[in-house]
């Protein structure tokens, strides 16, 4: 008997698969392969097996998907089994697929979806993918990227490597346009030919402010989980997923610097996720523009949808971002882990903002320069180098920043550079807080008074005033701890000024 079913799919271990290498071509290739399987090939496969009219795609992006299927349960089971094998074959064993389904009815959509997700979770926990060492011997060559068993030689650019089948497939997809295609088409409409960088080194060479400096920008949606749980119908879910996916893609394309040799490459784009590796001087402006455009676009798309407009209070959805700065030779794994940590910090700040609502959290941005410290974890760097304890606790930064504050600190950093204040004086200003509260104040005043031009002094004073700092400290009374917190914007400001063109 043919019934209606809701089918949910999920690809576990995406981060390990996509970001488990330090080669740009493999990272973007793995991401493109996953995106192609997820957004296009899964729906085509299901329709070919079960019939065009028997498959309705609710959404399929970001490593997950949801479909409404009309079929006999035995046919659905057989199709799901074949689909899992299809994912393994297409990725050469690099990806696996989890599926769950339940009988579907429009009246009980959310309950049916919960049952399908429960079945998917059950499959995941009962059949875990347990990593194990592969066979190694002195006469077997290891893969140069993942240490698996190499199967063939592969060339990209001037480099030749011995790779396993999984990594070869990543490289082959990395040679294609992949996620770059939509951005290239967007640029072509503007009469621009977008030239993609071939490796991390080339991205660093395109940094105009400080050569070889790069950044990894990682963004994720705020309060999305709560909003998804409030959805009651299939149509609402479809509207929501399409609006989010389209908005994050459009925001990314419009925010990227679109001129000639693009100093960036898109590593992850879909659902509410965004990751771009780019030159250090373009990262902060890109993050600001992407966050602002995403909120504007979702607000516009939901304006005609009473359900979402009511839940969001007429506002749009938001994303928070983490920016890990480094050099082109900084191991990607370090920049990735730091961007994840910074993203969590931003999302936490948004969830604690006084302007947050039940389904809304303001966008925040956090950033860190990995090459300035020895610690891998951002929290360790800040605890070791950016906290003073004399005689009371002093924090030498104000990160993360809300979107208005992030825009303000960028503008003031530009003003410092445009005022032609000598670079050595700016560096000394940035180091002043590290001297302690009293000596730091004296050093800051000395440098301020020693700045001869009135316009330059005004730029320094305006920047400190905007963030409530008095040469250079800001004291905030913490009522919960019954103590005074001392912070400064000066360190953050000078760090950011170092990446202004």
Placement of each model-derived feature along the sequence:
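Regulatory and interdomain segments flanking nucleotide-handling catalytic cores
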Residues: 1-501
């Amino acid at each position: 008997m043919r019934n209606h079913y809701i089918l949910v799919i999920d690809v576990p271990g995406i981060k390990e698969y996509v970001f488990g290498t330090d080669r740009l071509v493999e990272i973007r290739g793995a991401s493109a392969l996953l995106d192609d399987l997820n957004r296009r090939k899964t729906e085509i496969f299901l329709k070919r097996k079960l019939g065009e009219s028997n498959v309705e795609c609710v959404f399929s992006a970001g490593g997950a998907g949801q479909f409404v299927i009309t079929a006999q349960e035995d046919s659905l089971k057989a199709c799901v089994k074949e689909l899992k094998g299809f994912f393994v074959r297409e990725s050469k064993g690099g990806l696996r697929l989890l599926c769950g389904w339940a009988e579907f009815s429009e009246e009980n959509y959310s309950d049916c979806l919960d049952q399908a997700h429960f079945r998917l979770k059950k499959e995941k926990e009962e059949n875990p993918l347990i990593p194990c060492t592969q066979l190694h011997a002195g006469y077997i060559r290891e893969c140069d990227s993942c240490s698996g068993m190499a199967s063939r030689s592969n060339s990209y650019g001037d480099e030749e490597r011995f790779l396993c089948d999984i990594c070869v497939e990543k490289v082959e997809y990395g040679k294609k346009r992949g996620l770059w295609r939509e951005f290239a088409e967007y640029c072509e409409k503007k009469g621009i030919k977008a030239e993609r960088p071939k490796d991390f080194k080339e991205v660093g060479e395109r940094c105009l402010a400080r050569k070889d400096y790069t950044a990894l920008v990682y963004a994720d949606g705020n309060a999305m989980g709560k909003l998804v749980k409030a959805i009651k119908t299939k149509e609402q879910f479809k509207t929501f997923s399409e609006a989010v996916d389209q908005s994050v893609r459009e925001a990314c394309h419009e925010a990227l610097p679109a001129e000639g040799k693009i100093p960036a490459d898109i590593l992850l784009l879909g659902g509410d996720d965004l990751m771009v590796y780019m030159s250090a001087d373009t990262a902060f402006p890109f993050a600001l523009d992407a966050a602002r455009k995403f909120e504007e676009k979702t607000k516009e798309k939901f304006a005609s949808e009473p359900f979402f407009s009511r839940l969001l209070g007429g506002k749009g959805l938001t994303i928070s971002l983490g920016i890990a700065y480094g050099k082109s030779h900084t191991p990607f794994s370090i920049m990735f882990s730091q961007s994840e940590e910074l993203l969590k910090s931003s999302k936490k700040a948004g969830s604690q903002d006084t302007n947050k609502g039940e389904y809304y959290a303001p966008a925040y941005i956090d950033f860190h320069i990995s090459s300035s410290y020895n610690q891998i974890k951002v929290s360790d760097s800040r605890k070791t180098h950016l906290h003073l304890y004399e005689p009371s606790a002093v924090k030498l930064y104000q990160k993360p920043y809300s979107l208005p504050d992030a825009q303000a600190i960028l503008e003031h950093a530009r003003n410092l550079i445009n005022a032609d204040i000598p670079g050595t004086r700016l560096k000394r200003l940035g180091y002043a807080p590290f001297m302690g509260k009293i000596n730091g104040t004296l050093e800051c005043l000395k440098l301020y008074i020693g700045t001869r031009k009135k316009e330059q002094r005004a730029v320094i004073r305006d920047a400190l005033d905007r963030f409530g700092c008095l040469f250079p400290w800001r004291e905030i009374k913490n009522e919960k701890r019954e103590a005074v917190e001392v912070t400064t914007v000066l360190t953050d400001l000078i760090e950011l000024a170092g990446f202004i063109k």
